[in-house]
A protein has these predicted regions:
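Conserved short "hinge" loops at termini or chain/domain junctions
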Residues: 1-68, 82-195
Length: 195
């Protein structure tokens, strides 16, 4: 797996994609977070789709930009909690300079919650784009063709999830289990009784 970011393009791309980063984060410090985020996005969209995006390597391409933004947002969420702390020989120390002050815990919590909401909203945009443009999503994990509830539109006839494709995909394992353990045995019983 290759990253969508390199030491040469990271700072400019990261600021451009997140829209809120106002400082240069050294690539070496955030690289482990970028790797974790990339694996998570590959798990969602599938390796074939990721490889297709990686081959483009152009921020002007909408699909590339959507995937790269998802990786950047998730990497930032992973990186942020440790970015203000330094592990020294004397234990953890708060990084601070003369121009800034340490935020209150509630401010940090609110900030991290808003980052997460932004990330989830963006994943929905990415998934909508992929569905609309017939891009394959990780079909091994999110194959819905054999389900009674094959798509989000059918699901939302009964439960409103505000059009969140990401939430729908997260609920799929439970839907599959419910259909196999609860619905299919009942349908087989009804079919047997009517024969």
């Amino acid at each position: 797996m290759n990253l969508l970011f390199t030491p040469d393009n990271f700072s400019v791309r990261f600021r451009d994609l997140t829209g809120y980063a106002d400082a240069d984060i050294p690539f070496v410090k955030i690289k482990p977070s970028l790797e974790s985020a990339t694996y998570e996005i590959i798990e969602l969209i599938g390796e074939t789709s990721y490889n297709e995006v990686e081959a483009v390597d152009n921020l002007e391409n909408e699909y590339y930009r959507l995937v790269a933004r998802a990786v950047a947002l998730k990497a930032d969420i992973i990186y942020q909690p440790t970015s203000n702390l330094a592990r020294t020989k004397n234990g953890l120390k708060n990084r601070n300079d003369d121009q800034t002050s340490t935020p209150w815990k509630w401010q940090v919590d609110d900030y991290q919650a808003s980052l997460l909401q932004n990330y989830y909203r963006h994943l929905d945009v990415l998934l909508r784009y992929m569905i609309k443009n017939d891009k394959s999503i990780n079909l091994k994990k999110y194959d819905t063709k054999d389900l009674f509830v094959k798509d989000i539109e059918t699901f939302e006839q009964f439960f409103d999830i505000n059009g969140s494709h990401y939430l729908y995909f997260k609920l799929l394992p439970a839907l599959v289990e419910c259909e196999r353990k609860e619905i299919e045995p009942r349908v087989r019983t009804i079919t047997t009784l009517t024969d």
